[in-house]
Amino acid sequence: MLKKTALALAVLIASFDAQAAEALRVAADPIPHAQILEYVQKLDPQLQLKIIEIPNGVNSNELLAHGDVDANYFQHLPYLHSQEQALGQKFTVAATVHIEPLGIYSHRHTSFAQVPDKGTVAVPNNVTNLSRALYLLQANGLITLKPGFNDPAKDQATPKDIAENPRHLKILEIESPQIPRALDDVDLAVINGNYALEAGLSPAKDALELEKAQGNPYANILVTTPKLQDDPRIKQLAKDLNSPEVAKFITEKYAGSVIPVAVE
């Protein structure tokens, strides 16, 4: 299935190339990234963008490494670093744009006090967001990590690093895009902001608790290759993404569920 999806995506990218050879090809998650890029396109019509919405299961960093796109906009810096190691590639951060606070959600409970002994908690199964979820659970008094796990950006935690789990919570590692579907089956679910939005949730209203924006190391970034980092189109897109107009758009459209770095 993924091979068919990747093939279809390759055909889509090729058709974009045929339509506009000079357009900047940017791979993006549908929400909020592609929506933000669409606003940029309206804001700056002289900057030609080909926004390629990436389906779940397709690695935008592989597309970038292979030259199928010129940039991508979907990830945070810790995840990018893990991808550079996994793919043996070096990428370049062109702009730091917004934060999508990770949130803890529940369809069963309205407060953490209601979570029972041996309750179930769904968390992302990729390394960086799994660690991020554990730090958020710790920040809300549900678990305690071992000494030495102090910096979420540097000290990546796994369930083996839980020192105290007073409610004997069962940590279930699930593919990030699938976690919203598990809400009815678990006591708590830790969901990335973009997947919460895609599922029709409002992080600012529906989450029991969100990550704090101040000092958050998980800001979403525009990424390109070292070869293209000085491309005028990349520089203009980075400038647009960090503009007051885009910050205002993000603030008004997402109402605290997505936070522009400019007003963090």
Task: Please name every model-derived segment.
Residues 95-106, 131-138, 197-238, 241-264:
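Periplasmic-binding protein-like
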Residues 31-32, 55-57, 72-81, 98, ...:
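Beta->alpha turn/N-cap motifs
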Residues 52-62, 149-181:
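Short helix-initiation/N-cap motifs at beta->coil->alpha
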Residues 94-144, 247:
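A conserved helix-loop-strand patch within extracytoplasmic ligand-binding domains
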Residues 23, 27-52, 59, 63:
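Short, polar/charged alpha-helical segment
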Residues 57-88, 104, 110, 196-200:
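Pocket-flanking alpha-helical
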Residues 82-94, 107-109, 183-185, 190, ...:
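Ligand-binding "clamshell"
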